[in-house]
A protein has these predicted regions:
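Metalloprotease/metallohydrolase-associated module, dominated by Zn2+-dependent proteases
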Residues: 1-30, 34-91, 107-162
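Active-site recognition of the HExxH zinc-binding catalytic motif
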Residues: 95-107
């Protein structure tokens, strides 16, 4: 069975990144957790995962803490694989947390009397590019992607020149 514990090291990194690059998250509740072992998805190791907790699970958190839940309860959770974290360099750790923070969004309603809405965003090319600009090719999968892009550009040039 998978176990989870709080991840203060991830939280420290996230706080700095939020201040620098993700200011829309400054007043958003985020919990940081270690997952004891990495999950896998489609044959790939999952280093981290961003989640939105709302509804019954969010209310249950307040019940366990023995405080009164607000009318609308929602928060984010960043889950990081503790076993894989140990294999990463410090710059890779920062890049991983930055990448996961890119998935956390806040929709501001047009009506002044409406509440903001927390959303999980998919992989966005602009945000992906921003993380690569800030941290470089921090994972082998990103290097593989770059090589594929380079190969495609070479093929396009050959077809254009040929």
């Amino acid at each position: 069975m998978t176990s989870y514990t709080t991840a203060p090291a991830v939280e420290r990194i996230a706080e700095k990144l939020i201040e620098q690059h993700h200011r829309h998250l400054l007043d958003v509740p985020i919990r940081y957790l270690w997952r004891d072992k990495a999950a896998s998805s489609k044959g790939n190791v999952v280093l981290g995962k961003a989640r939105k907790v709302t509804g019954l699970p969010a209310h249950l958190v307040h019940l366990v803490r023995k405080d009164e839940p607000p009318e609308e309860v929602e928060f984010f959770v960043l889950e990081i694989a503790a076993d894989m974290w140990q294999t990463l360099t410090e710059p890779q750790r920062v890049a991983l947390v930055d990448h996961e923070l890119c998935h956390l969004g806040v929709e501001i309603p047009e009506r002044a009397d409406a509440d903001r809405k927390l959303v999980i965003r998919g992989h966005d090319l602009e945000e992906f590019a921003a993380v690569v600009e800030r941290h470089g090719l921090w994972r082998p999968a990103i290097e593989t992607f770059r090589a594929a892009v380079d190969a495609q550009l070479t093929l396009d040039e050959a077809m254009r020149d040929g």
